[in-house]
Curated annotation (Swiss-Prot):
GO molecular function per UniProt: ribosomal large subunit binding
Alphabetic keyword roster: Cytoplasm, Protein biosynthesis
Organism: Desulfosudis oleivorans (strain DSM 6200 / JCM 39069 / Hxd3) (Desulfococcus oleovorans)
Gene name tied to this protein: frr
SUPFAM superfamilies assigned: Ribosome recycling factor, RRF (SSF55194)
Major location (coarse): cytoplasm
Protein name (record): Ribosome-recycling factor
């Protein structure tokens, strides 16, 4: 019975950590990364199509992303989708390929981005704490229903707290690494 509670919080906290890592991939750091283009959907002949299914994406230099649509007629649609994606990059189009030049970030912009990443980390920590609260409520209800003893309830809450602390520590580690990446010139 308790194992189900532990498995559930491990699963939920693991997913929360993965979501945080995926969210961080979309944060600009001054270096070109194809992750910036994740989630961009192009209206291709009336069908919403992910950009990576319409074009060849590459990073030939550290500050340049090159997008080469397989269908040259879709280049305007791709350009429009990039502009609508609000990734703070302006595409330049030569008729065959689209180039996204990543400008170097100013010190103020770096600090602003680091602050935003910190907020994201805090939001995910709150999500972890909510998962912990739900697990503790479940344990309390199980004790009340007589499914577990008081000792098992305390031991369960202790284990839930340790798991929560571990995941919050992982979020902090991921955040620190991303912050370092953002702030380095």
């Amino acid at each position: 019975m308790l194992e189900l509670v532990y498995e559930e919080i491990e699963e939920k906290m693991g997913k929360t950590l993965e979501v945080f890592k995926n969210d961080l991939k979309k944060v600009r750091t001054g270096r070109a990364s194809l992750a910036l283009l994740d989630g961009i959907v192009v209206d291709y002949y009336g069908t919403p199509t992910p950009l990576n299914q319409l074009a060849s994406l590459s990073v030939p230099e550290s500050r340049l992303i090159v997008i080469q649509p397989w269908d040259a007629t879709a280049i305007k649609d791709v350009e429009k989708a990039i502009l609508q994606a609000n990734i703070d990059l302006t595409p330049s189009n030569d008729g065959k390929v689209i180039r996204l030049s990543i400008p170097p970030l100013t010190e103020d912009r770096r600090k602003e981005i680091a602050k935003r990443v910190n907020q994201m980390a805090e939001e995910h920590k709150v999500a972890m704490r909510n998962i912990r609260r739900d697990a503790n409520e479940t344990l309390k209800q199980m004790k009340k229903d007589g499914d577990i003893s008081e000792d098992e309830s305390f031991a369960g809450k202790d284990k839930v707290q340790k798991v929560t602390d571990g995941y919050i520590e992982r979020i902090d580690e991921v955040f620190k690494a991303k912050e370092k990446e953002i702030l380095e010139l």
